[in-house]
Amino acid sequence: MKRIYPNEKWCLGCHLCEYYCSFANSGCKDMVQALKDKKIFPRIRVEGDERVTFALSCRHCSDPLCIKACISGALHKEDGAVMIDYDRCVGCQSCILACPFGAIVQGENGVIQKCELCLKNSTGAPACVLGCPNHALEYKELAEPKKSKKKGARTK
């Protein structure tokens, strides 16, 4: 499955990925109309300090703790991506507490929001990746690490 991979060596901390994400998920066709004088609610965010910055978004884990924690069944896997059923989300924030990466946040209307890889936007790649001027975000598929038997493990 393709995922977003940040490269902190190339991230300038410009936050353009956040703006492109907010615009792509705004439903507007005009960026100025979508973002001017409004608080943005991106599904990706830039973290770091003066030494290093990087973009943080949902990792779409193979065994997501957020789905297990969701009491309303609003989170589910779809083609490998963790997706939200906004009509089912009750805003309890149990998934926010369960996510070890802090990639889920409460949105402006009380329900949660997280990166859904722009799968519903039909752009071919997430807007944050397409908009990053320094190519600090990559949308690619990496081979899953093979599980190996530990040395000295007993077998029957």
Please place each PLM-identified region on the residue numbering.
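Extreme N-terminal starter segment of soluble prokaryotic enzymes
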Residues: 1-3
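Flanking helices and flexible, charged tails adjoining ferredoxin-like Fe-S electron-transfer domains
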Residues: 5-7, 27-72, 86-156
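A positional/architectural concept
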Residues: 12-24, 28-30, 43-44
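Conserved C2H2 zinc-finger inter-finger linkers
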Residues: 77-78, 108
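Short glycine/acidic-rich loop motifs that flank beta-strands on beta-rich extracellular proteins
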Residues: 79-80, 142
